[in-house]
Amino acid sequence: MITGFQIIEEGIFQKITDELDKIGLHYRLFSRSKDEKSILEKIDRKESEGNPYEKDKHLIQDIIGIRVVTYFRDDVELVKQILPRILSFKDEEIDSPELTVFSPKRTNIICNFTDDQIKIFNEVKSTSSKSYFDLLDTTFELQLRTMLSEG
């Protein structure tokens, strides 16, 4: 585990928990931060797929992942409306439902770190000799799902 990433992860987790608890929503929250092995595997996989990460161009955006799981589809939309109050959304990918196929709808959002989180990230980076830090973005992935899509 990379301690600085865990500190950032825990802060994001708590911030989301505090905001969602204010509205009395029923949900579950999961989080993880990538360890060195996982980061290196992802870098290798993307390179073998012909889509390598590049410094200052194509960066890993999910060193931290947060998943909010709600009981109802409408609650996913509610969470998506509420969280921009406390998080900075950068990009999103939302599945378009097919009327003839039963499948979960994925909502994945890339969020920017706060200034304080960037400071922690940069402190970890400055004390590390690992070159992969140049391939890491100061963002995290937020996934919104329903219980049904969790299987």
Predicted regions mapped to residue ranges:
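Nucleic-acid processing machinery
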Residues: 1-151
